[in-house]
From Swiss-Prot:
Keyword RNA-binding: no
Record has Ribonucleoprotein as a keyword: yes
UniProt xrefs under HAMAP family: Ribosomal_bL28
Name listed for the protein in its UniProt record: Large ribosomal subunit protein bL28
Designated gene of the protein: rpmB
Gene source species: Thermosynechococcus vestitus (strain NIES-2133 / IAM M-273 / BP-1)
Molecular functions (GO terms): structural constituent of ribosome
């Protein structure tokens, strides 16, 4: 499974690890992804999503249906 948030589409970022002597080596900054079971009131069931922690906070504010519609995600297929 790829490390991508299912609602926001966030994925890894390419960055530099910079040492004290300022030598640069490339590193990958991964997204903090968590498996989350969310109650979907319209479908009357639980939906299991792989979300970034930022998406979990936004989900609490917006609600699942509005956030999924904005992301273009069909919850019936999950």
């Amino acid at each position: 499974m790829s490390r991508v948030c299912q609602l926001t589409g966030k994925k890894a970022n390419n960055a530099y690890a910079i040492s004290h002597s300022h030598r640069r080596t490339k590193k990958l900054q991964q997204v903090n992804l968590q498996w989350k079971r969310v109650w979907w009131p319209e479908g009357k069931r639980w939906v299991r999503l792989r979300l970034s922690t930022k998406a979990i906070k936004t989900l609490e504010r917006k609600g699942l249906s509005a956030f999924a519609k904005e992301a273009g995600l069909d919850l019936n297929k999950l």
